[in-house]
Structure formats: C-alpha cells, structure tokens
Amino acid sequence: LFGTLDEHNRFAGPETMAPPWNAPAEGATPTMDGFVADYISFFTWEKGRQPTYDEYAQIMQCYTPEQVPVLNGLAREFGVFDHWFCEVPSQTFMNRSFWTAATCTPLPTGGTANSPVSHWIKDNTAETLFNRLESLGKTWKVYVKDGQIPLTGVIHWPRLRDRFATHFVPFEEFEDDAAAGTLPDFSLIEPNLLLGHGDYHPAAGAALAPGVDLQVDPPSSILSGEMFLERLFTAYRNMRSPEGANVWNTTLFIGWDEPGGTYDHVPPGPVPAPDAAAPAGQFDFRFDRSGYRVPAIVVSPWVEPGSVYNQEHRHTSMLATLRDKWGLGEPFTQRDAAAKPFDYVFSRQTPTDPDAWDVPAALPAPPYHVEWESSDKSLSTLGKAALPGVIAAAKAKGLPLPPEVEDPNFHLTTELFYDIQVLVGAHFWPKMGPQGADMVARLEDLKKALHDATKPEA
C-alpha cells in the first residue's frame, strides 16, 4: 500500500523478515504503488529466482465482467459498494474475525497473522456477534460448503465451542431452511475454503523451497466461486414461504475477507484501533491501519437496481448495521463504533419482482470443482494451515488418532490428509461428518491406511 520495502527485507520470507517490517512512516498516506515490488520480492524468496514480466504482471490484472457473469450480474441487478475496505492489511483469519467481533487483539500475537492457529483456538476470547445475538433472543447458524472444519469455529473457538454441535451445519441445510422459511435471524455462509477453493480464490502458492514450482494449493478456478454463488442466489431467490423467512424480508450480503494482494488504486482511510490500550501485535502492528478495498454486493428486492454506493464502509459496518436494526447494545470495539451502517441502501417503496431479476448463469467449471476425486482430495494451503491446530485440540479432547498423524517426519498423502480432516472435523462439528459406527469405521480405515503407508517395501 505504501511502496515501502526495507532493503534488508527485500527477498525475505515471513520467517526471516526483520523490524521495522516494511512499515510506513507514522501518519503516511498510502501511495498504492508497491504491489509489483512486493510481488517480485516474495516470488524471488519463494521460488529462488526473479519472475519474468509476464509473471509479475499478473498482480496488476483483473477479471472481465464476461469471465464472472454471476458476480457481475448481481452487481448490476442490485447494489454494489465501491468503497468497502477490509479491516486489516493482512490475511484471512484476522479479517474474518473483524466481520463478527470487530477485533482479533486478544491473541498473544495481536492476531496479525493466520499462524499459529493454536493461538486462535486457545486465546481469541473476544465477544462475537453470535454471542450477542443469542443473549438477546436472536437465532443464528453457520452453513458450510464442502468442508468439515468451519473457519468461523476455528477463529472464534473459545467463544463458540459449546455451539459447534448445534449451530454449524452443511450448506445443503441452508437450501432446505431457505425453501421452508425457517432460516435463523442471522446466517453466515462459508464457501469451500479447505478443499481447493470455491470462494473466487485462484490457486495460489508454491512449495516453499528454492527452485521448486509445485503448487501447494490444488488446482483451482474462480469459476467454482461462480458456481457456488449461483447456487446460493438461486436458493435466496426462491424463498417464497408465506410465513417465516422469505425473499422479501431477508437480505443476501456478499462480501470477501481480504483482497489477496492484487492491485488497487484507492487508498484506505484512517481507522481507530479496536482497543487503543492493547499492546502492539505481531510485527509491531497496532491495528491502526486499514486494509484496502474488497467487493461487496447487497441483494434485496428493496434495493434500487444498479445502485453504486460511494460511502466508506468496512467489515464492521455489518456489526454497526445489525446493532442499530436489532438493538444489540454497545459497540463491540472502537472499530465498529466508528463504522457506518448501510441501512440506507433499502430505498425502494415497493419491492422488485424476484421472477424478473436478470442474473446470468455461471460458466462451466473444470472437473476438479465438480468431483473432488479429480484433485486427489487435496486440501488448500488454508486447510493445511488450519488442520494441525485442530488435530492438537482433538487429541487433547480424546479423539484416538494414530500417532503418525502428529509425526513431523511422516509424509501424509493428500488423501490421508483429507481423511484426517473429515474425522477431526466430525469430532468437533458432528453435523459436518460421520458419526457413531461410521465414525469408528472411518477411524479403522485411517489406521490401516497409515499402517500400510509405513510398511517397508518388499
């Protein structure tokens, strides 16, 4: 954002970077001119060579409306925010925590990076939207697509652990609840984040060894995000129950956690730290700088078609809006206290007709997003990062996983890694995976597979 790259951090990786961590000068305004330099530096560290022009030019590119017809169609048919910023110039876990808690500062590291995941599981004690809703008699669920480990549960583990068995369910249950008019007051929907990507996230990352070009992520395509969004929108559009939740009294909000490092020209404005008294976090970050823009679309028959909202918003605008609408009490932190609600978007006096909404269908996706066997059941880098901490928590709670699972010298194939994810996820989130006799059988199959993998060749 600031074009700042300390000479001693040029070509350095996350583990070797040193103070002052490429930090800008106090009070500096983002110049939005450091994307290529940062990409070249990280690429060189990761792959052991300088990128070519065609390689580093990718960070300045974007997708055309024709390549993402569902996303583009929703933006044109409903309302789009063109000044919606993520909360932290960092990774997934931090920004997702701000969506639902307006902070991540209780962590010992200040919550500046995804890892170590164990800190999130043990120490993120911040009050969440879900806790506040429940205390005031409101209902909620987290619906998860194609995965047994909900990131919302991992991020807010200490606060939500007692609700894992009841409030975290497969996405198919959302479709059923939407059709029946039985959606809760607040639904959070997680796309597929662990098995490849179903979240508009292209494949990313390479093996972290110089000169090795193996992908860490399984094959991925933004078209899988298009497929999922079309399915989600279809379920929303068809909500016609005469009682309970329906399309006329329910809003679909589409947002992202962070932009991933690709180019943008609009600098983020200043933000207050969630807790000004909190100590600096990892990399000496004080949470007083915002991340940059992400897409945000609001879908409702009460939204004027083709609207573009120019007011500045961030993820905590969701909390500010819900606090106002439902009387949820005091702000969670100084960040959502300063956030602007977006209730002004519901400006129509009469609703539009859902049957007349014009949103194109998704383009065909590659086979590895239709049938996971095509990618050998590979987990994404995010899935691989989250799993060790969840495994440790499962072992501590008595799940009898084979010892090889925690042996750093034992090579887990992608299929074994996937099977472990299924079992560990089902242990904590029983609605997300096998239970009872099926769980026992899957554990025995895993033990046998691990035993076979360690047998010496004849």
How would you name each of these model-derived features?
Residues 1-458:
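N-terminal pro-sequences and low-complexity stem/linker regions of secreted or lumenal proteins
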